[in-house]
């Protein structure tokens, strides 16, 4: 059966510092690196044909580190489609080498929710300034965005169409897919896969560096139980 693996990136340096991150391109912390490798061990025996990540380095690092322990021994290779000379110069000219790679596609549509004017701000300081209730609304409501940022609803408006139009066709071709992305972009996708209501999705928690695995069969997504 075709597999769909979703994974929130490992702890980032700003997760560690308790700062709102959003689209700021922050790398993994040392703990995040360990989480990504440990998560890789949990999926090391699952077949993977294609990898999708966001355009942010913490998701890309997570995918690469997770694949470093995969039993296939195949090498994840970032594609540079549409990037002019880089696309041409990054070509692989050995069919044997090509067969031992797994394509990695980066997409901004899978980026974390954009937190606007909260980005780079300490979460506790923000609660003191605006009140814990207001910050909770910004973080956990479905349709209320932070100042100049995205709500979860707005995030879903880009992640779900990308998933349906770009990723699902590969699943239907029986390709096993691994997506390394972010808490909110993955929550919005899981909302679709599990048929969650808006009240349910805002309560959904995704731990860093923990895979969520689905079996895909004839347009049906069956979540594997832990």
Swiss-Prot record:
List site positions: Transition state stabilizer.
182
What pathway does the annotation place this protein in?
A: Carbohydrate degradation; glycolysis; pyruvate from D-glyceraldehyde 3-phosphate: step 3/5
- Which positions are catalytic residues? 9, 112
**Which residues form each disulfide bond in the chain?**
none
EC top class, as a word: isomerase
| An MF annotation (GO) of this entry | phosphoglycerate mutase activity
Could you tell me the Gene Ontology terms of the biological process aspect for this record? gluconeogenesis; glycolytic process
Sorted alphabetically, the keyword list is: Gluconeogenesis, Glycolysis, Isomerase
Entry's family note: Belongs to the phosphoglycerate mutase family. BPG-dependent PGAM subfamily.
> What is the protein name stated in its UniProt record?
2,3-bisphosphoglycerate-dependent phosphoglycerate mutase
Protein source organism: Protochlamydia amoebophila (strain UWE25)
Q: What is the lineage of its organism?
A: Bacteria, Pseudomonadati, Chlamydiota, Chlamydiia, Parachlamydiales
